[in-house]
Design a protein with these regions (language model features):
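C-terminal cap of thioredoxin/glutaredoxin-like
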Residues: 454-457, 466-473, 534-606
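C-terminal ends of transmembrane helices
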Residues: 7-11, 78-95, 142-153, 196-207, ...
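Entry/N-cap segments of selected transmembrane alpha helices
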Residues: 87-115, 184-196, 315-340, 363, ...
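Membrane-interfacial segments at transmembrane helix termini in multi-pass membrane proteins
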Residues: 243-266, 350-360, 401-440
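Conserved redox-active cysteine motifs that mediate thiol-disulfide chemistry
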Residues: 459-469, 493-496
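Conserved helix-turn-beta segment immediately C-terminal to the redox Cys motif
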Residues: 468-489
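Transmembrane alpha-helix boundary signature
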Residues: 34-46, 59-65, 79-95, 111-131
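Predominantly late transmembrane helices and immediately cytosolic-facing juxtamembrane segments
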Residues: 2-16, 32-36, 49, 194, ...
């Protein structure tokens, strides 16, 4: 069976990310053109326009630039905080084995750029601007990766996004610890009380949570601002106390029941109940990222670029930047520090055996991504505004950020192109990208058998079901000479229950029931709803409580995703797909054909 896309369709999401990066770049160019046009004086005049709000005798006033940097950017940091919370709770950073390399690389990519910057600016006011070079702009990073378009970027993209999460944590910590004003204890104590109240909001009735979160978040922003801490960190603080979870079976099934009732008797009461039930089956963290994310990407960040990227690039500024250790410190920190820090740390971690890269991800690919990580736009410009008070020096730092971003993009492009030229990729999908691992893979037959047959399959695919008979005959023919390996390739576009079935098989595998569960799901392919899957798990002897916990664990989902990403790396789009002794089998998959292919793969065969 063929599917047009593997796993959850990422096209719309990636298109949105690329469009957001393009819009951010467009507004950056507009800001630079505006600041260098005959109307350049209107740029600063416009962003210094005061905006006030009065309530009785109370009066507050911000400039338009402060409104963007201090208020609207709180939403950006809110989204960053939500994504950090999700990654550490249910995402890539829940498993040490997959997190250690990008985490260590990110730490090196934070520290080495700062050290290099301080070599250029060891003292004086400019030395405090070391935070400008520590962060990577995730939006531009994703957009640059899409423009350069290295082949099969899935694993590299996951690595870089994981790295970016740790990068964001470091940048947020730097802002909180080193770039806040004089601390006012009373206001901060009020902020702590408000934060405790935010933690308790989850216990309120669902209908009251949204408004309560909003009111307390605004109050926290005001308290942090009064307390001397940069108020945008209110967004992070609120995000970190908002709960996140994977969809729970009970809530999903409850939503299905309400929808079924609405289908049988459509009315406004059932419609409201169905909407509420569907909403509550997804964590508020995910709903907020989905709801606010586009406004941040297509509204807040472009406005931030327009307000902060307007650097006057006249001859005097350019010559001053060329002679300025501040500018060179920013460029060297971002371009050299990120490339050497991330790549070097990755090499060291692999060398000493502390961690390993995902299958198909090489150090050369990491180097290209590390170079792109030198695009430190959004938070870099944000910290320029916090760390440097002198307008002339701030402009020189902004020139450094813009120059570093261009050089980092060019460096990443060159590394990807040169490594592909000197080390051309092998034919896609001809060989397995990941060797069989007896400690990880699902095997039948002796571990040390001389012949290996690997199948990428889908439990809802009728052809995979028919192939099980062929596999049984092949195994009977070779006996102990053959080991058979199953790997997942759920084609969700054509088999909507395939991913759930794959997860169920992995949850059963944790109780030693993988092939038992697979056999019964193949027998009843038309009945793979959750109530059926739980019945099958019970029939094969699984502990249902443990099965339910494992089914919704990140470990199980990542295990299926690993196989799916391997398949994407090899450009597999059909099931079943077989590999005979590591080489792709492109002929028929009846038992006779598979037996001939296995016999021909023996050493010394003609």
């Amino acid at each position: 069976m063929r599917g047009s896309r593997l796993g959850r369709d990422p096209t719309a999401k990636r298109f949105g990310e690329n469009a957001a990066a393009a819009l951010l770049l467009t507004f950056t160019v507009v800001a630079i053109l505006w600041a260098n046009s005959p109307w350049a004086h209107t740029y600063s005049e416009f962003w210094e326009t005061p905006v006030g709000l009065s309530f009785g005798e109370l009066h507050g006033e911000l400039t338009l630039k402060e409104l963007v940097n201090d208020a609207l950017m709180a939403f950006f940091f809110f989204i960053v905080g939500l994504e950090v919370k999700a990654q550490f709770t249910i995402g890539e950073l829940t498993e040490r084995s997959r997190a250690v390399v990008p985490v260590v690389a990110a730490i090196a990519g934070l520290t080495l750029p700062a050290v290099i910057f301080l070599l250029f600016n060891p003292s004086g006011e400019d030395a405090s601007a070391w935070g400008v070079v520590i962060s990577t702009d995730t939006a531009f990073l994703v957009g640059a990766l899409a423009i350069i378009a290295p082949k099969y970027p899935a694993r590299l993209r996951t690595f870089l996004l994981t790295l970016a999460v740790v990068d964001d944590v470091g940048a947020l910590a730097a802002i909180a610890l080193f770039y806040s004003d004089r601390i006012r204890v009373v206001a901060l104590l009020i902020a702590v009380v408000l934060l405790a109240a935010l933690i308790g909001v989850r216990h309120l009735p669902a209908a009251a949570r949204g408004l309560t979160y909003s009111v307390l978040a605004v109050a926290l922003w005001l308290a942090l601002s009064a307390g001397g801490v940069h108020p945008t960190l209110a967004g992070v603080a609120v995000a970190l106390v908002i709960p996140v979870f994977t969809p729970e079976r009970q809530r999903v099934e409850a939503a299905v029941e309400v929808i079924r009732a609405f289908r049988q008797s459509p009315n406004s009461q059932y419609a409201r109940a169905a909407t509420r039930s569907l909403r509550d089956s997804i964590s508020i963290n995910e709903r907020l990222v989905t709801g606010f994310g586009p406004y941040v990407s297509f509204g807040v960040l472009p406005l931030f670029a327009l307000a902060n990227a307007g650097v006057r690039l006249d001859a005097d500024t350019v010559m001053a930047a060329i002679r300025s250790p501040l500018t060179w410190g920013v460029v060297a920190g971002l371009v050299v520090g990120k490339l050497v820090g991330i790549t070097g740390a990755t090499w060291i971690v692999r060398r000493i055996g502390l961690g390993r890269l995902s299958p198909g991800l090489t150090l050369r690919r990491v180097a290209g991504g590390a170079a792109l990580s030198g695009i430190g736009f959004t938070i870099s410009l944000f910290i320029v505004d916090l760390a440097i008070k002198d307008p002339r020096s701030a402009d020189l730092a902004r020139v450094g950020v813009l120059a570093a971003s261009l050089i980092a993009f060019a460096s990443g492009w060159a590394i990807f192109r040169l490594t592909d030229w000197f080390s051309p990729p092998v034919a896609v999908g001809h060989r397995l990208v990941r060797d069989v691992d007896p400690d990880r893979d699902h095997l039948r037959g002796p571990v040390d058998a001389p012949l290996t047959l690997v199948e990428y399959g889908d439990f809802e695919c009728p052809f995979c079901s028919r192939a099980t008979g062929s596999i049984d005959e092949v195994r009977a023919h070779f006996g102990d000479q053959l080991r058979y390996v199953w790997r997942h390739l759920p084609l969700e576009r054509v088999h909507p229950r395939a991913l759930d079935a794959a997860r169920a098989s992995e949850a059963a595998a944790l109780q030693g029931k993988f092939f038992d569960m697979g056999t019964i799901m193949f027998q009843f392919q038309d009945f793979l709803e959750w109530q059926h899957i739980y019945r099958y798990a019970d029939q094969v002897g699984c502990d249902i409580a443990r099965f339910d916990d494992d089914l919704h664990s990140p470990r199980v989902l990542h295990r299926v995703d690993d196989d799916t990403q391997d398949a994407e790396l090899m450009d597999l789009s059909a099931t079943p797909t077989f590999f005979v002794n590591g080489v792709r089998h492109r002929g028929p998959w009846d038992s006779a054909s598979l037996i001939r292919a296995l016999e021909a793969s023996r050493p010394g065969s003609p």
